Amino acid sequence: MMKYELKSTSGMARRGRLTFSRPQGECYVETPAFMPVGTYGTVKGMTPEEVKATGAQILLGNTFHLWLRPGQEIMKMHGDLHDFMQWHGPILTDSGGFQVLSLGKLRKIKEEGVTFQNPISGEKIFLSPEKSMEIQYDLGSDIVMIFDECTPYPATLEYAKKSMEMSLRWAKRSRTRFDELANPRALFGIVQGSTYEELRRESVKGLINIGFDGYAVGGLAVGEPKEEMHRILEFTTPLLPQDKPRYLMGVGKPEDLVEGVRRGIDMFDCVMPTRNARNGHLFVSDGVVKIRNAKYKNDTTPLDAECDCYTCKNYTKAYLYHLDKCGEILGARLNTIHNLRYYQRLMAQIRQAIEQDCFDEFVVEFYAKIGKEVPPLHLKSE
């Protein structure tokens, strides 16, 4: 069970709360929320306790990868994904659609589903909307995503239309199988339509007719210019139900989160804070620190004076530079702790600004600190 409560707004920005019924009682996710990505049932290099300490309340797991390894049977032997990875908060799982897109020539898309070559074993396997619902049921996902085709960019109007229409048919099949399983959790629809406004409108209408607990905006952050992403968000979010959460999939940089919230988005996920951390790319209050730069070799200041994370409270830039130079695992861990905490602090600041109805002022201050211009906002009136 999942409930969404819209608590306050500031412009298009929304402050809300998701409530989940878990075996240990009710769990809350304050929105706008950022979900760290635990592809294989782990946020890389972090224990669940460490992830929780950054302020994260919900994680994302990857249906496709967990299906291939360790598989449904091993998952069921433990109970579900929560028991397997020992994270007892809510988990959202994606449906596998994006991973299938990324396989490129290794996959063949038909009406029934997708046949592809297992990237691990080389064998041919088949994933359908029904199978995706069954895997996510066994994972015990608190938020299940429908199986869709993530339309690649660029796409012709003809291709994008066919792709969106098939995704709608798959959405209906996902809903039917989800209900047949008597899954008590939440099911989210995914809006497709590439960069074509009329297709996005048609997709939203079709999904609302089927009926979902929340709505994701998919098919963005797949190579399109930022201006295009902003334009499609500005067009799409006003069409979505006010009383349901909105999720922007696979996004993104700190400024992308701010821009998503400006356009009415409630939930985000991205590998960026964790992947960038392992590459020495660290997010700080006034921009970015690339810790591999030799200028940090003798720098005895903390990474970010405004940050309260374990890394910033205990270590200097010189130490983090040293760990990275030596290839020490601890360096990647400390970097990850910081980046995840940065993202959660950013979301907390966003929520507070919406509560105080001063989100526009927050946006101006945020961009001033990182030395960038505030992108224009051209919201469509419906």
Swiss-Prot record:
Known cofactor(s): Zn(2+)
InterPro entries in the cross-refs: ArchSynthase1/Queuine_TRR (IPR050076), TGT (IPR004803), TGT-like_sf (IPR036511), tRNA_ribo_trans-like (IPR002616)
Alphabetical keyword list: Glycosyltransferase, Metal-binding, Queuosine biosynthesis, Transferase, tRNA processing, Zinc
GO MF terms held by the record: metal ion binding; tRNA-guanosine(34) queuine transglycosylase activity
Record-annotated active site: 94 (proton acceptor), 269 (nucleophile)
Highest taxon of source: Bacteria
Reactions the enzyme catalyzes: 7-aminomethyl-7-carbaguanine + guanosine(34) in tRNA = 7-aminomethyl-7-carbaguanosine(34) in tRNA + guanine
Any one cellular-component term (Gene Ontology): cytosol
Biological process annotations from GO: queuosine biosynthetic process; tRNA wobble guanine modification; tRNA-guanine transglycosylation
EC number: 2.4.2.29
Cofactor note: Binds 1 zinc ion per subunit.
Coiled-coil portions: none
Binding site for substrate: 94-98, 148, 192, 219
Summary of the function given for this chain in its UniProt record: Catalyzes the base-exchange of a guanine (G) residue with the queuine precursor 7-aminomethyl-7-deazaguanine (PreQ1) at position 34 (anticodon wobble position) in tRNAs with GU(N) anticodons (tRNA-Asp, -Asn, -His and -Tyr). Catalysis occurs through a double-displacement mechanism. The nucleophile active site attacks the C1' of nucleotide 34 to detach the guanine base from the RNA, forming a covalent enzyme-RNA intermediate. The proton acceptor active site deprotonates the incoming PreQ1, allowing a nucleophilic attack on the C1' of the ribose to form the product.
Family statement: Belongs to the queuine tRNA-ribosyltransferase family.
Name of the protein in its database record: Queuine tRNA-ribosyltransferase
Species of the source: Haemophilus ducreyi (strain 35000HP / ATCC 700724)
